[in-house]
Amino acid sequence: MIGRITGLLLEKHPPLVLVDVQGTGYEIDVPMSTFCKLPDIGKKVTLHTHFWVREDVHLLFGFMTEQERALFRQLTKISGIGARTGLAILSGLSVTDLHQAVVSQDSIRLTKIPGIGKKTAERLLLELRDKIDPVAILSEAGAAASNVDKDILSALLALGYNGREVNRALEQLSEGVTVSDGIMQSLKFLSKVK
């Protein structure tokens, strides 16, 4: 398996790039999120790669970050999501945006990606729901900056509320609230919403 490639960037033609590694040129398919971050032609580039083997073709996919590659691997494990669809998803949404869509169960966001219909979006959300840590993702996005917010978030998720409901509840909390008061305020808010 080829896990990473470092070499000279020779060509860029979306979604394909050509990287020269000591005289051998590797054609690598990349999502647009990676393509936009590539250096100029002739510069050194490092890509985290995934080697895709099928009976009729061997393909190399490249990603600027390990998180993109890990998410690509998760996506392609889902029934009906192939490598091209995985690339399309990563081209349409950043890793953080996709994680937020999964946490908030936002299928509309996914259906805006070419090739992703309503059923595929719902299947993606269902399959990825348990594989993504909402606390880590919301922290990345700045939505749960304090430990108090994280504790409230964890408690509400443990009670069975989904990410979208929890986000709305966290947004209405007053500044400097304690964990217990925050949970109580959130539960009151959520009971009115339902």
From Swiss-Prot:
It holds the Pfam family RuvA_C. Residues 140-143 are annotated as: Flexible linker. InterPro entries: DNA_helicase_Holl-junc_RuvA_I, Hlx-hairpin-Hlx_DNA-bd_motif, NA-bd_OB-fold, RuvA, RuvA_2-like, RuvA_C, RuvA_C_sf. GO terms for molecular function: ATP binding; four-way junction DNA binding; four-way junction helicase activity. Residues 65-140 are annotated as: Domain II. SUPFAM superfamilies: DNA helicase RuvA subunit, C-terminal domain (SSF46929), Nucleic acid-binding proteins (SSF50249), RuvA domain 2-like (SSF47781). The keyword Cytoplasm applies. It is found in: Cytoplasm. One of its GO terms (biological process) is DNA recombination. CDD domains: UBA_RuvA_C (cd14332). Its main location: cytoplasm. Residues 1-64 are annotated as: Domain I. Keywords: Cytoplasm, DNA damage, DNA recombination, DNA repair, DNA-binding. The keyword Endoplasmic reticulum does not apply. Residues 144-194 are annotated as: Domain III. GO terms for cellular component: cytoplasm; Holliday junction helicase complex; Holliday junction resolvase complex. Homotetramer. Forms an RuvA(8)-RuvB(12)-Holliday junction (HJ) complex. HJ DNA is sandwiched between 2 RuvA tetramers; dsDNA enters through RuvA and exits via RuvB. An RuvB hexamer assembles on each DNA strand where it exits the tetramer. Each RuvB hexamer is contacted by two RuvA subunits (via domain III) on 2 adjacent RuvB subunits; this complex drives branch migration. In the full resolvosome a probable DNA-RuvA(4)-RuvB(12)-RuvC(2) complex forms which resolves the HJ. Belongs to the RuvA family. The RuvA-RuvB-RuvC complex processes Holliday junction (HJ) DNA during genetic recombination and DNA repair, while the RuvA-RuvB complex plays an important role in the rescue of blocked DNA replication forks via replication fork reversal (RFR). RuvA specifically binds to HJ cruciform DNA, conferring on it an open structure. The RuvB hexamer acts as an ATP-dependent pump, pulling dsDNA into and through the RuvAB complex. HJ branch migration allows RuvC to scan DNA until it finds its consensus sequence, where it cleaves and resolves the cruciform DNA. Has three domains with a flexible linker between the domains II and III and assumes an 'L' shape. Domain III is highly mobile and contacts RuvB. This is Holliday junction branch migration complex subunit RuvA.
